[in-house]
């Protein structure tokens, strides 16, 4: 069944409508400790949720693991969930990823609705059917493709976010601009993230979601063009896992932004991406995201992490690169020297 994405101007009305189209002998609402405090109050008095069962998990990506997943399964079981129950995931990407995985595996699958509350989840995590958890220090190592019945996007939740979380989600929007068209990219690399115009941002969010929807609809299980969405993610996931391993975790969008620096450099070297556009994009990222401190001694660990990437085939590290804005080159390979050169550029500029 095709996932429906609703850009909502009236959250209660649209949630009631979505619930009415789903089986629901019982309703469970999954939040983490942060969204329970900041976002649950915005919907807790909705009549449709008056008899719901709340499930609250610990916040942050470090808890996106088997232990937390088991807690959710146990809460569903203790709450009397059946195959006809409904779970609503209210939160950022950690909640929608883990909650979607829990729902899609409990009793072989129950319906779920995603209400993303972070910019990152609105434009990326909650749309497209990817669910999962981290395992063995690796990002999203275990998971399944499973569409929520509905994704309800309501930008009122953006006022709960700090600047870092706005920037984190914006990195995925920048990626969507790079794989889309020049007009979208040009608007994104000139947007003032320090003083965001929320009306403009809301319009850009809707456009960004449409970019991802078009790609996912064409290739739901990532056999071809959906790999375009992996721009920045081969290096980005390595940066993210590396930071997690050394006990200094970074937000996913920051990791993707750093990954785009290396992969745009690789695009300029290998697939003729225009150097002026590379430098303009890299300058925007450096000004808004800072950097991740790495040394040459870290390169073997980072490359080892890239070897674990799910996009790889036969032990060869695969990248999504660009020939130009909107000119996507999937299944690109690079040897270790080329990767080290890109890491040098990331580190030294």
Regions found by a protein language model. Give the residues of each.
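Catalytic, metal-anchored helix/loop core of enzyme active sites in primary metabolism
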Residues: 1, 218-220, 243, 339-349
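ATP/NTP phosphate-donor binding region
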Residues: 1-86
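Short glycine/serine/threonine-rich phosphate/pyrophosphate-binding segments
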Residues: 94-101, 122, 238
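A glycine/threonine-rich phosphate-anchoring loop and its flanking beta-alpha core
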Residues: 101-193
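C-terminal charged capping/lid subdomain of soluble metabolic enzymes
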Residues: 173, 275-349
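Active-site segments that bind and position negatively charged phosphate/pyrophosphate groups
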Residues: 187, 191-300
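Generic secondary-structure signature for well-ordered alpha-helical cores
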Residues: 81, 147-150, 156-163, 171-183, ...
